[in-house]
C-alpha cells in the first residue's frame, strides 16, 4: 500500500465475541512485523513490513502510542464520532504492553471509563447509556474494544 508492505490476516478477525455478539474486528489489518509476530508464532516473515501508516487503528485515529488521563478527551471524541456515524463498537489499540496496561488500569480498573462516557454526552446528541457498557480486552494485540449501550 503506497509502496509499503503490510500483513493482513482476515482469517483471524473472528466477528463473534465471547458473549456471542457479532462485531466486525480489524485486529489484523495492515500490520507490521512486530504486530503480527505478537500472535503468529509459526510465521515466516517474507517481506520487510516495518511501516505503520496504513494500519487500521492509526488510519482511524484509534491508536494510542501511550495512554494517560490526558487522553480522555480524545477518547470521548472517538466514542462520540462512532455514535454519530451510527455505530457503537469502538476498537482501541495501544502501542506497547505498558501503554495497554496503563489504559486498562486508568479506564477499567478505576472505572474512569464511565467519566469518559459522561464527557462524551457533551459531544453528541445521540442517546446512549453512561452507566452501562461492555468491553473486551486482548492483551496479545494490546486491544480494548468498547461496546456502548444505546
Q: Positions of the model-derived regions?
A:
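N-terminal accessory/pre-domain segments preceding catalytic cores
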Residues: 32-150
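Hydrophobic/aromatic-rich core segments of domains that either
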Residues: 1-32
